[in-house]
Amino acid sequence: MMDKESPQFKMLKLTLANLDWEDEGEAWDDSAFLPLPDRESLTDSEREDLDWVVARDRRKFANMPMVRDRFDFRVAPLFGALLQSPRLARLWAESGDFFITAKARGTMNEMDRAWLDMALVPLLVNGWVQSGNIAVAGGLGITAEAIEAIRQDRLDVLAPEARKLVDLAQAVARGTLGADQFKALASEYGTKWVVEAIGYVVFRIGSAIIDSVLWQVQGIEGGPHIVDEMITALAEGRLGQQNMFDKEGFARDRLKSS
């Protein structure tokens, strides 16, 4: 059963703001959402990219159990904006798919990515990105106490394995990852793993910025308060089993479509 007051549901109202939320008391200005470009204005390759991204967004929607059976599919506002440049939209989507399928390729697993994401909670500019990652991390067993410790820079309380991943992500974000730290990580995880982890952190930071900007230009304001709501809900055991986005299901679908 969908809890309409849950932080997950509030986030979906932002992520998919162009769905018909009228019965939920939300009133978004439809005129602010960027329409998909006129196909006749695109080159053949741009039309191919547009179709690829729309099909990918449809697969993603099909893996959102809280909304897929209630609403008709629409391209989410983020990709509605990115698709003004179809090639950019496809490159961005393919980058995300590359990281979400990392486990199948033998590099980062879901828990690895979750700790890298939690390391960025105090550093990102977009509350929505942080909150979504917190919901995923909580589902994997990362506690609210651990997330708060990262927010408060009390990294010494983290388990050694988690601390290594948090230190890596924050060093990348701050531009301080040096040769010694890189070599130590590479000797434990493998050079390919570390390079992909660096790429993932950079992608996450970029995603937080571009998501925030492309939402704002379409009149969607999330605000940082949802981060505190999500952590409180996790601490109080209120997140439950509500899954905003079945990442593993999407990853399987993505690999099948390759």
Map each language-model feature to its residues.
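Histidine/lysine/aspartate-rich catalytic loop segments that bind and position anionic ligands
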Residues: 136-159
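A short structural micro-motif
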Residues: 98-99, 121-125, 155-157, 175, ...
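Preference for long, well-ordered alpha-helical segments
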Residues: 191-242
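Alpha-helical scaffolds flanking conserved acidic
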Residues: 108-116, 193-196
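Acidic/histidine-rich alpha-helical segments that form the ligand environment
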Residues: 161-199
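Secretory/endomembrane lumenal or extracellular ectodomains immediately following the signal peptide
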Residues: 1-112, 223-258
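Short, thiol/selenol-centered motifs that function as redox-active sites or metal-ligating centers
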Residues: 113-135, 147, 201-204, 208
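Short acidic alpha-helix initiation/capping motifs at coil-to-helix transition points
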Residues: 26-29, 69-70, 90-94, 125-130, ...
